[in-house]
Amino acid sequence: MLKAVILIGGPQKGTRFRPLSFEVPKPLFPVAGVPMVQHHIEACSKVPNLKEILLIGFYQPNEALSSFLLKAQQEFKVAIRYLQEYSALGTGGGIYHFRDQILSGGPQAFFVMNADVCSEFPLVPMLDFHKQHGGSQSYVILGTTANRTQSLNYGCIVSNGDTQEVLHYVEKPGTFVSDIINCGIYLFSPSIFQHIAEVFQRNQLELQLFSCISEENSSWQRTEVIRLEQDVFTTLAGHGKLYVYKTEGCWSQIKSAGSAIYASRLYLSQYSTTHPERLASTKEGGPTIRGNVYIHPTANVDPSAVLGPNVSVGMGVTVGAGVRIRESIILHGAVLQDHSCVLNTIVGWDSMVGRWARVEGTPSDPNPNDPYSKIDSETLFREGKLTPSITILGCNVSIPAEVVILNSIVLPHKELSRSFKNQIIL
C-alpha cells in the first residue's frame, strides 16, 4: 500500500503570487483550467495501490478547500484529507508532525511533493526505480537538468553516474556544484522518520544549549521546524540511502504569477495526450482556435474571437466580438468586451476589459535556445524600476475602453480611467 503527501504551504507563503492569492489559496489557483494541486492529485490517483492522499499546510480550512477536496475524492476515487499545521513547520517538520497519520495502515512507501511545481509527475517510474535501489531502506529525489547559472537557485545534487546514489546535496549553493537540481518530488520509505527524528532531537539539544531566551513560548515550535532539503538530505547524502531519479520531462516551479502562464502552457501541451477532450478546436460557427486552448463549457465566446496559443478561459467568462487572446489566463466571470486585446496577462475574477482596450505583459519564459533553461523568478524591482513581466488584473478590476495597460499589476477592486505602463496600481 502507498500514500502521497502534498505540501501546500499557507497564507504567509506564496507572497510572490499576489494579488492572485488574495482571493484563493495558491494551490487552488486554476492552471490549464483546473486547480494547481489537482494535477498532483490526478497523477497520484494513477499510481497502482495508492490508497490515500494527505494535503499538509497551515491554511485555515475554508469552504473553497473543503469543496475542492470533496469533488476531487469523488472524481479520482481516492481518499483525500487535509491536515492543518499549527504553524509553518518546514518541508520535513510537517510530515514529521503528522507521521502517525502518514504511517497508519502500514504503507510500504509514500510520495511527498510540493504543490507549487508543474511536472509530468513520473511517479510510477520513480516507484520502479525505488524498488531497484534498496526499497525499504532507500529514498528517491526526482531530479532534472538545469543550466549552470540557474542551478544556483535550486537544490543541487551530485550523484554517482552508475548507481544514481546522491553523494552530495547542497541547497542553493553560492558557487556551481551540479547541474542536476531537486524537483521537489520525493519517494520515501517509512524509515525516513528515523532520520527526521534525529534532526528533531538535535534541534532540541541545541535549544537547551542556547536557552537564554526563556520567556519565549515558541521553543517547541522551533524544534519542530525541519527542512528536508537542508536538514535531512545533506546528512543522508553519501551514505548509500539517497538516490536521484532523473527526468527529461517538462518541469517548472510556480512561484510567481507569471510562472502560472508558463505552467499552463506545459499542462495544455500535455492535454493533447492525457486529456484531448479539454482542448478546444476551431469549429464551424465557433471562435478561431490557434494552438492549445482550454475553454470552460459555461464560457460564452463570440465566433469572431481568436484565441491561442496557450489560453485558458474560466467558468462564466464572456468574450466579445473580435477579441484577441494569447498566452493568457482568463478567470471566472471576467468580461472581455468587443475588439479588446489580451496578451501575456492574467485577467482576475469578475474583471472587465473595455472595448478596443489592450492589456499586455512581457513573457518571462525560459531561454528557448537553451534546452536546460528554467523560468527565472525575477525580483519585482530591478534598479528601482518595476521588472517587465506579465500583466495581472486582480479580482473585480475595470479597464475602460480604448486604453493600454502594459507590464502592470493592478490590485483588486480598482476602476481605472486611463492607460498605465510599468506600474503597480494600488
UniProtKB/Swiss-Prot annotation:
GO molecular function terms noted in the UniProt entry: GTP binding; mannose-1-phosphate guanylyltransferase (GTP) activity
Catalytic activity of the protein: alpha-D-mannose 1-phosphate + GTP + H(+) = GDP-alpha-D-mannose + diphosphate
Annotated Gene Ontology cellular component terms: cytoplasm
Gene3D superfamilies referenced in this protein's UniProt entry, alphabetically: Hexapeptide repeat proteins, Spore Coat Polysaccharide Biosynthesis Protein SpsA, Chain A
Entry EC no(s): 2.7.7.13
EC top class, as a word: transferase
Native species: Xenopus laevis (African clawed frog)
Known pathway: Nucleotide-sugar biosynthesis; GDP-alpha-D-mannose biosynthesis; GDP-alpha-D-mannose from alpha-D-mannose 1-phosphate (GTP route): step 1/1
UniProt gene name: gmppa-b
Keyword Transmembrane helix set for record: no
The keyword Nucleotidyltransferase is assigned to this record: yes
Protein's name in the database: Mannose-1-phosphate guanyltransferase alpha-B
Pfam families: GMPPB_C (PF25087), NTP_transferase (PF00483)
Family designation: Belongs to the transferase hexapeptide repeat family.
Keywords: GTP-binding, Nucleotide-binding, Nucleotidyltransferase, Transferase
